[in-house]
């Protein structure tokens, strides 16, 4: 990965310079990355982009050309710029595994590092993880709507730039898509690629039939034909059937057809009848054309004959929910070996962070269904031989007690004392992990509209800490 050290908001660097001038830059602090609302109006968010975050951290450095540029801004002391010359990340980063399902206000990534290091990485960390998590979650919803039909990512040409196209394709496959049309993403991440022909192929020939015959001649064993250039039912499908019969007579198996416009439900049903009558009942009928999870769900409920889906613009841009509002907040500062918790208060209760150095534990019932998450201080333990009572962090009278349960701590080390502990996994393996994670959720949390809210509670110790800090801040204001 290229050096992205200067991929940051300008205010980070003057803060670093200020910390340096005040000689507090080496103070050890704890930051949490979390989000306040799920991606894509979903009941959950799939964490994605961890491998790229690790690459970013591993490549942090200030080469001479960067230092020269920073000097030209006339914002930084020469002493500070000399200090940056030897920059190396030396802290700890703990994160949930890539593909883990998470929920609002839970620490997704926790950084414990010298202040200047922890502050510098905020912007890049957020842009990497926010975007890929958004697209992975959107892809998961689209695939859920498809009810097991294969979904292909077709969005590169509509992505908001090359990086969004490349890393969006990665995230989409992690979220459940079977393949991408993005060749570079296929090469970079070793993920399946798909594609056949555009309307321009059909238009270039004197007739639609001639174009189909030419394509079948070149790709007799990978022949999927685009049938909506002129007239799906009166031209496209009949011509495709002629070509398919010829392929079959010569020992080849055609793949199917794609419809990219029109009334997809009606056209697919009628096309299916024609294919069945011609003896091609097992062929794929792929639909594209501005699809998303809601359109696919409506088509499936209408008994369409589509059995694979190419989803582009509304997936790669997450069109109806185009950002994940992940944030990165100071949670604690060390004074020697003592942890001093930090809290940000706000008139908006949603923006009051959970203080301290924390971890997240997931609680499962005996059927291995996720029942609740518990945010705890990092040194707390749970005795699973005893009943566990959790309560809503705001409506504290709402309690749930678990008796026959198991737990899993969600965070794993990415870096310890600057040493990388992360082990890369194949994308398809991460995709399977996502499916395993989703299988632990009740269907109510996966509804496309109005999903049930998953329980995320605070331990008694953390709740007491937060309440006391809020009380102290209120007293200070008086």
Regions found by a protein language model. Name each.
Residues 1-221, 248, 253, 329-478:
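Ordered alpha/beta subdomains of enzyme catalytic regions
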Residues 200-371:
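Glycine-rich phosphate/ribose-binding loops and adjacent secondary-structure elements
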């Amino acid at each position: 990965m290229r050096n992205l050290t200067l991929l940051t908001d300008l205010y980070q660097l003057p803060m670093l310079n200020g910390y340096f001038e005040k000689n507090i830059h080496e103070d050890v602090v704890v930051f949490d990355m979390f989000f306040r609302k799920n991606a894509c109006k979903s009941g959950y968010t799939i964490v994605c982009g961890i491998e790229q975050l690790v690459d970013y951290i591993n490549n942090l450095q200030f080469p001479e050309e960067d230092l020269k540029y920073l000097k030209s801004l006339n914002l930084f002391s020469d002493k500070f710029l000399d200090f940056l010359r030897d920059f190396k990340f030396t802290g700890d980063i703990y994160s949930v595994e890539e593909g883990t399902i998470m929920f609002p206000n839970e620490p997704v990534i926790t950084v414990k590092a010298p202040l200047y290091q922890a502050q510098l990485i905020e912007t890049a960390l957020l842009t990497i993880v926010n975007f890929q998590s958004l697209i992975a979650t959107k892809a998961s919803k689209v695939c859920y709507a498809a009810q097991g039909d294969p979904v292909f990512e077709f969005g590169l040409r509509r992505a908001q730039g090359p990086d969004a196209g490349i890393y969006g394709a990665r995230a989409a496959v992690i979220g459940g898509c079977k393949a991408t049309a993005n060749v570079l993403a296929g090469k970079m991440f070793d993920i399946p690629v798909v594609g056949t022909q555009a309307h321009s192929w059909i238009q270039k020939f004197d007739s639609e039939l001639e174009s189909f015959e030419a394509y079948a001649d070149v790709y007799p064993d990978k022949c999927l034909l685009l049938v909506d250039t002129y007239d799906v039912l009166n031209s496209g499908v009949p011509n495709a059937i002629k070509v398919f019969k010829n392929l079959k007579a010569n020992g080849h198996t055609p793949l199917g057809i794609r419809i990219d416009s029109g009334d997809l439900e009606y056209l697919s049903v009628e096309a299916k009848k024609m294919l069945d009558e011609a003896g091609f009942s097992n062929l794929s009928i792929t639909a594209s054309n501005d699809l998303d999870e809601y359109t696919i769900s409506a088509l499936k409920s209408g008994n369409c004959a589509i059995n694979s889906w190419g989803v582009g613009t509304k997936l790669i841009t997450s069109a109806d929910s185009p950002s994940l509002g992940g944030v990165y907040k100071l949670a604690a500062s060390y004074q020697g070996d003592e942890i001093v918790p930090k809290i940000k208060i706000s008139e908006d209760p949603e923006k009051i962070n959970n203080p301290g150095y924390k971890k997240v534990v997931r609680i499962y019932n005996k059927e291995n269904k996720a029942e609740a998450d518990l945010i705890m201080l990092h040194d707390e333990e749970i005795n699973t031989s005893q009943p566990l009572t959790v309560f809503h962090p705001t409506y504290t009278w709402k309690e749930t007690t678990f008796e026959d349960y198991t737990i899993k701590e969600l965070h794993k080390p990415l870096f310890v004392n600057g040493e990388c502990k992360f082990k890369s996994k194949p994308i398809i393996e991460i995709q399977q992990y996502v499916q395993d994670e989703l299988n632990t959720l009740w269907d109510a949390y996966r509804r496309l509209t109005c999903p049930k809210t998953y329980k995320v509670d605070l331990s008694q110790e953390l709740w007491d800490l937060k309440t006391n800090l809020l009380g102290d801040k209120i007293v200070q204001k008086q």
